[in-house]
């Protein structure tokens, strides 16, 4: 409203004043004394010229005033355009200011959100660091247990290798005995060409040899029976091992140890049987040396010798088959040991992962009462299952008598206490 009022006043101020009033203002004005100022016109001859000159000056003044009014109008329009442009620029700047303020507010909210996310990430990093430290401690304890188990396994393997070497030595002795028997057979053939007497004594000696052969056959049948028992025990052991793996991997370790001891006992029994057979062979060798001078080439003795030779060949083949079966059993036992080691490693890995998952859940949730001791240590599970549930295990430090709630805490404390 003030702008329109000022505009109207400005237009009225620059309007040209024409007509008689303007002429009157030009021709005469009031003097300071209140009297009208009259033009001192000359005489009648100079009045038209003066009037003409005054009119021309008045016209020039009007033209000048008109030009100045035109210039003022143009300046006024320029001023109005400038004010409109300033107003538009102000509105644009106000809009930009509002947008900038909204942007600042949004950036402030995003900054707060990012700050919260940063704090949450820092908390998660701290949690992961604690989990990583706990995993390192668990890894150290598992490594110690694996080292002890590997030591036990190496000790059992060394015992098995010693037993295998003894068995190979016995087989070498058996081969040496067979070589000696072949030498005796060649000597018998030589003596068979030289002697042709004492048929009755040879018959009696043949009967004694037959008795020895019967004893040898009985011993061979006994060994076959023991081999069959060993095979049945092995199949039963394999079935029990398979069932035991499905039911309990940790319990199968001790069961496998007992079965390994049974196999060692059976192997020792087989070695004792081989030693007894070697003694029988030695006795037969002594008897052959004693009766070497009285042997002759009679058909009956030759037939008995052929029968003895055939029985000896059959016995040697049976011994070779027994050795092959023994090697096959040894390979199967080694295969079972490898499978057992793999299953044990996978069981330990799954137990470790399950323990880590439980710990992660316990850390993320509210604090809970301490878990039972039989759940804290996966390797101590079989012994704790056999113990009565009413008697809690004693996790006590042997150095400072510190009572730990579980096996993991006890292992960590013992390592720190020793250091």
UniProtKB/Swiss-Prot annotation:
Coiled coil: 49-356
Classification via Gene3D superfamilies: L1 transposable element, trimerization domain (1.20.5.390), Nemo cc2-lz domain - 1d5 darpin complex (1.20.5.990)
Primary subcellular site in the record, as a coarse category: cytoplasm
GO molecular function: identical protein binding; K63-linked polyubiquitin modification-dependent protein binding; linear polyubiquitin binding; polyubiquitin modification-dependent protein binding; protein domain specific binding; protein heterodimerization activity; protein homodimerization activity; signaling adaptor activity
Effect in UniProt of substituting residue 326 to R: Abolishes MARCH2F-mediated K48-linked ubiquitination and subsequent suppression of antiviral and antibacterial innate immune response
Region (Ubiquitin-binding (UBAN)): 242-350
Keywords assigned: Coiled coil, Cytoplasm, Disease variant, Disulfide bond, DNA damage, Ectodermal dysplasia, Host-virus interaction, Isopeptide bond, Metal-binding, Nucleus, Osteopetrosis, Phosphoprotein, Transcription, Transcription regulation, Ubl conjugation, Zinc, Zinc-finger
Region (Disordered): 358-395
Effect of residue 115 to R: No change in the ubiquitination level
Residues covered by region (Required for interaction with TNFAIP3): 251-419
InterPro entries found in the cross-reference section: CC2-LZ_dom, NEMO_N, NEMO_ZF, Optineurin/NFkB_EssMod
Effect annotated for changing residue 325 to R: No effect on MARCH2F-mediated K48-linked ubiquitination
Renumbered residue ranges of the record's region Required for interaction with and ubiquitination by MARCHF2: 1-197
Tissue expression: Heart, brain, placenta, lung, liver, skeletal muscle, kidney and pancreas.
Outcome after substituting residue 323 to D: Greatly impairs tandem ubiquitin binding
Consequence the record notes for mutating residue 336 to A: Impairs oligomerization, impairs binding of 'Lys-63'-linked ubiuitin, impairs TNF-induced NF-kappa-B activation
Result of altering residue 315 to Q: Greatly impairs tandem ubiquitin binding
Gene Ontology CC annotations of this record: cytoplasm; cytosol; IkappaB kinase complex; mitotic spindle; nucleoplasm; nucleus; protein-containing complex; spindle pole
Impact reported for residue 300 to D: Greatly impairs tandem ubiquitin binding
Subunit and partners: Homodimer; disulfide-linked. Component of the I-kappa-B-kinase (IKK) core complex consisting of CHUK, IKBKB and IKBKG; probably four alpha/CHUK-beta/IKBKB dimers are associated with four gamma/IKBKG subunits. The IKK core complex seems to associate with regulatory or adapter proteins to form a IKK-signalosome holo-complex. The IKK complex associates with TERF2IP/RAP1, leading to promote IKK-mediated phosphorylation of RELA/p65. Part of a complex composed of NCOA2, NCOA3, CHUK/IKKA, IKBKB, IKBKG and CREBBP. Interacts with COPS3, CYLD, NALP2, TRPC4AP and PIDD1.
Noted disease: Ectodermal dysplasia and immunodeficiency 1: A form of ectoderma dysplasia, a heterogeneous group of disorders due to abnormal development of two or more ectodermal structures. EDAID1 is an X-linked recessive disorder characterized by absence of sweat glands, sparse scalp hair, rare conical teeth and immunological abnormalities resulting in severe infectious diseases. Severely affected individuals may also show lymphedema, osteopetrosis, and, rarely, hematologic abnormalities. The phenotype is highly variable, and may be fatal in childhood. Immunodeficiency 33: An X-linked recessive disorder characterized by variably impaired immunologic function and early-onset recurrent infections, usually due to pneumococcus, H.influenzae, and atypical mycobacteria. Features of hypohidrotic ectodermal dysplasia are generally not present, although some patients may have conical teeth or hypodontia.
Entry function: Regulatory subunit of the IKK core complex which phosphorylates inhibitors of NF-kappa-B thus leading to the dissociation of the inhibitor/NF-kappa-B complex and ultimately the degradation of the inhibitor. Its binding to scaffolding polyubiquitin plays a key role in IKK activation by multiple signaling receptor pathways. Can recognize and bind both 'Lys-63'-linked and linear polyubiquitin upon cell stimulation, with a much higher affinity for linear polyubiquitin. Could be implicated in NF-kappa-B-mediated protection from cytokine toxicity. Essential for viral activation of IRF3.
Stated name of the protein: NF-kappa-B essential modulator
Gene source species: Homo sapiens
């Amino acid at each position: 409203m003030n702008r329109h009022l000022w505009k109207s006043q400005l237009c009225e101020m620059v309007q040209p004043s024409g007509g008689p009033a303007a002429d009157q203002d030009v021709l005469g004005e009031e003097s300071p004394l209140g009297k009208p100022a009259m033009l001192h016109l000359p005489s009648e001859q100079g009045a038209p010229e003066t009037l003409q000159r005054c009119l021309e000056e008045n016209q020039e003044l009007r033209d000048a005033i008109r030009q100045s009014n035109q210039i003022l109008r143009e300046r006024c329009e320029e001023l109005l355009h400038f004010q409109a442009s300033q107003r538009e620029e102000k509105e644009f700047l106000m809009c930009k200011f509002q947008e900038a303020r909204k942007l600042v507010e949004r950036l402030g909210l995003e900054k707060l959100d990012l700050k919260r996310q940063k704090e949450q990430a820092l908390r998660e990093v701290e949690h992961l660091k604690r989990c990583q430290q706990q995993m390192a401690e668990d890894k150290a304890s598992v490594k110690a247990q694996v080292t002890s188990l590997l030591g036990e396994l190496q000790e059992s393997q060394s015992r098995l290798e010693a037993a295998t070497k003894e068995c190979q030595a016995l087989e070498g002795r058996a081969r040496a005995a067979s070589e000696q028997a072949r030498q005796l057979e060649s000597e018998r053939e030589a003596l068979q060409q030289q002697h042709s007497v004492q048929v009755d004594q040879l018959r009696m000696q043949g009967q004694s040899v037959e008795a020895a052969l019967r004893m040898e056959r009985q011993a061979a049948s006994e060994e076959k029976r023991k081999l069959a028992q060993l095979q049945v025990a092995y199949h039963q052991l394999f079935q029990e091992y398979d069932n035991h793996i499905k039911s309990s991997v940790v319990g199968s370790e001790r069961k496998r140890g007992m079965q390994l001891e049974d196999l060692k006992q059976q192997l020792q029994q087989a070695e004792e049987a081989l030693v007894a057979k070697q003694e029988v062979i030695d006795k037969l060798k002594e008897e052959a040396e004693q009766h070497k001078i009285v042997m002759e080439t009679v058909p009956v003795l030759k037939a008995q010798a052929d029968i003895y030779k055939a029985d000896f060949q059959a016995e040697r083949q049976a011994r070779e088959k027994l050795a092959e079966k023994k090697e096959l059993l040894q390979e199967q036992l080694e295969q079972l040991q490898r499978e057992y080691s793999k299953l044990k490693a996978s069981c330990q890995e799954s137990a470790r992962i399950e323990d880590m998952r439980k710990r992660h859940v316990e850390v993320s949730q509210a604090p809970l009462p301490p878990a039972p001791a039989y759940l804290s240590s996966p390797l101590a599970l079989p012994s704790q299952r056999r113990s009565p549930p009413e008697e809690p295990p004693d996790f006590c430090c042997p150095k400072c008598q510190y009572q730990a709630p579980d096996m993991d805490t006890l292992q960590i404390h013992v390592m720190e206490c020793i250091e």
